[in-house]
């Protein structure tokens, strides 16, 4: 690549505007010399936790964020430094660390990225749920808006054993997600998330099955919503969500190279052309990879390895 941004230039971009604006700049400018063979991949951004791998990294300084109590919202402002989160562009491999000192998880907790999406205005949003390995009460799910400044809200309306995940920024500007038990098991609720307070509210009466896990939300340009149902052995079914139907509409069993997909999906997104894309790996295989998904047959085609926890499509 002939036009590569320096660390200083990338850092200036990230601080001057939103994180996604910097990534969009990388996509539109730095990739102009080497467009992807598959245009659907150009705007895919991944997120993971841990140390940065590449040399192109920028650290966003400490910012003020507002946390809201999970049961009684308040206006208490505290200094929180979101760290341990790394953004990465699929097509360039360029990475960006979000902070560098205080972790989102406390000592004795493991940071679980339970949701990642892009809002209609381009702001990236991540849901994190610290998992405790001690007997103390774990920190509830947080949603962090990766803008300038970074803002973090504690999700309110969750029960002690619940977490919010599978975030989706809808075409009409809302933020929705799936609520289930912290171990990923039913019952599952489709909820709307207040962008100002973090409060959740149920938005429809779709009844999800009690013997399958539900994960991921994707909306295509035509407004159709998709998710996946995962059976006991990891068998994964693509389904459509229709507010006029009481149950999810089963479309197809997912498979790759003629083999039944057996490990659920990390992410499901829809490109501007209406192509469903999935992130995941078959059981006992690494790393994760991005796959195209045929909505009718369930056939998945491996496009590119991408060793991240979740993906979204950055919006300009």
Regions found by a protein language model. Give the residues of each.
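Beta-propeller fold detector
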Residues: 96-103, 150-157, 201-207, 248-256, ...
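Short loop/turn segments that connect beta-strands within beta-propeller blades
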Residues: 90-93, 144-148, 194-197, 242-246, ...
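Repeated scaffold domains used in trafficking and secretory/extracellular systems
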Residues: 107-116, 160-168, 210-217, 260-268, ...
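Residue-level detector of Asp-centered blade-edge/turn motifs that repeat once per structural unit
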Residues: 118-121, 170-172, 220-222, 270-273, ...
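Short glycine/acidic-enriched loop and turn motifs that connect beta-strands
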Residues: 51-55, 130-134, 181-185, 231-235, ...
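Conserved beta-propeller blade signature
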Residues: 43-46, 124-125, 175-177, 225-227, ...
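C-terminal segment of N-terminal export signals and the immediately downstream linker at the start
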Residues: 4, 25-51
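N-terminal secretory signal peptides and thylakoid transit peptides that target proteins
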Residues: 1-18
């Amino acid at each position: 690549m002939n036009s590569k941004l320096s660390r200083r230039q990338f850092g200036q971009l990230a601080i001057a505007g939103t994180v996604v604006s910097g990534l969009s700049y990388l996509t539109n400018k730095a990739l102009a010399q080497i467009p992807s063979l598959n245009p659907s991949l150009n705007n895919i951004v991944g997120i993971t936790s841990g140390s940065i791998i590449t040399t192109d990294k920028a650290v966003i300084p400490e910012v003020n964020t507002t946390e809201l109590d999970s049961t009684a919202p308040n206006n208490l402002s505290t200094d929180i430094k979101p760290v341990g989160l790394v953004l990465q562009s699929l097509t360039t491999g360029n990475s960006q660390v979000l902070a560098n000192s205080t972790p989102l998880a406390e000592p004795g907790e493991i940071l679980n990225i339970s949701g990642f999406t892009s809002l209609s205005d381009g702001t990236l949003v991540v849901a994190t749920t610290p998992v405790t390995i001690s007997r103390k009460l774990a920190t509830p799910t947080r949603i962090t808006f990766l803008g300038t400044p970074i803002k973090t809200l504690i999700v309110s309306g969750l029960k002690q054993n619940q977490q919010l995940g599978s975030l989706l920024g809808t075409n009409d500007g809302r933020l929705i997600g799936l609520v289930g038990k912290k171990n990923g098991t039913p019952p599952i609720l489709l909820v709307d998330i207040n962008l100002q307070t973090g409060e959740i509210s149920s938005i429809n009466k779709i009844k999800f099955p009690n013997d399958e896990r539900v994960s991921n939300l994707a909306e295509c340009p035509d407004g159709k919503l998709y998710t996946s149902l995962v059976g006991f052995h990891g068998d994964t079914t693509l389904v459509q969500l229709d507010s006029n139907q009481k149950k999810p509409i089963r479309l197809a069993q997912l498979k790759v190279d003629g083999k039944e997909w057996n490990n659920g999906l990390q992410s499901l997104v829809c490109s501007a052309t209406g192509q469903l894309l999935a992130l995941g790996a078959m059981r006992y295989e690494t790393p994760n990879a991005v796959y195209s998904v045929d909505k009718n047959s369930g056939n998945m085609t491996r496009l590119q390895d991408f060793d991240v926890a979740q993906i979204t499509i950055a919006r300009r």
